[in-house]
Amino acid sequence: MIVTEKAPAKLNLSLDTPMRYFDGSPQWDMVMVSADLADYVTVETHRRPATIKVYTNSGFLPNDQRNLAYQAAHILRSRFHCKDGVTIRIKKQIPVAAGLGGGSSDAAAVLRALNSIWRLGLSLSELAKIALTIDSDVPYCIYNKLAHVTGHGEKIELLPPQPHYWAVIAKQKISVSTPQILRQINYEKLQHLNNEALLTNLKKEDWQEATKYMGNVLEPLTMKFYPEIGRLKNKMKELGADVAQMSGTGPTVFAICHTESRAKRIQNSIRGFCRDVHVVTLL
């Protein structure tokens, strides 16, 4: 049986980390939304050979157990004692190592596909619990809806859908090491966000007021190594973006606009120094 799942990119409307757990991992307090920039993940099961294979159209991704999609298939197959082999084909459109959760979204797509193929009958919340064993972003990617995400990434509160907005997603030709950025966090000096105010306005469906409270506490840490991220963000603001900020640990910067025409204007204006630019809708 063959199933194809859409695996959208995620954006951090807010990203904060209140503390570090005893194991050294950050506690997250984030508001996340998905964007219509997506990979397409085709999953096929077969009796022979009883192996897991991953194929992608990107030379930057591993095709073995280092790939999160591979891990998703392995974990689900082991947990439910399924003996089928699994072939995963990923058509990449989300930039790799960009802070957009592409690998996590691919893994979530594999979990959803195999849940359907093997008729496991797992709810989204049950899939999300399994997803947490793969990576902290995978539980959110099971849902792909506007949500407040806390803890290790396992606590997910879905929020009311927002008006139709456009996003300009731009990735410069730089690579950011997430572990390197997370090691830079000094919790005594971190400038925390007012996520409570952001959530209040999102729940009232007052998007314009909510934009005042969006942000990413990791921006200064990443920009210390890559100041060009700050220059791109400022350029987007100058061009009229409602919001412009970094997603995840970077390097991707996104702008949110209430009209497609403004989003296109920003896209055309920054293409000269940033070729990987997409205009998409928020989901």
UniProtKB/Swiss-Prot annotation:
| Pfam families noted in UniProt | GHMP_kinases_C, GHMP_kinases_N
Q: Which GO terms describe its biological process?
A: isopentenyl diphosphate biosynthetic process, methylerythritol 4-phosphate pathway; terpenoid biosynthetic process
Q: What does this protein do?
A: Catalyzes the phosphorylation of the position 2 hydroxy group of 4-diphosphocytidyl-2C-methyl-D-erythritol.
Q: Please tell me whether the keyword ATP-binding is annotated for this protein.
A: yes
Question: Which protein are we looking at?
Answer: 4-diphosphocytidyl-2-C-methyl-D-erythritol kinase
Name the reaction it catalyses.
4-CDP-2-C-methyl-D-erythritol + ATP = 4-CDP-2-C-methyl-D-erythritol 2-phosphate + ADP + H(+)
> Sorted alphabetically, which PANTHER family does this protein's record hold?
4-DIPHOSPHOCYTIDYL-2-C-METHYL-D-ERYTHRITOL KINASE, CHLOROPLASTIC (PTHR43527:SF2)
Into which family does the record put it?
A: Belongs to the GHMP kinase family. IspE subfamily.
GO MF annotations, alphabetized:
4-(cytidine 5'-diphospho)-2-C-methyl-D-erythritol kinase activity; ATP binding
* Active site as annotated: K10, D137
Reported EC number(s) for this entry are: 2.7.1.148
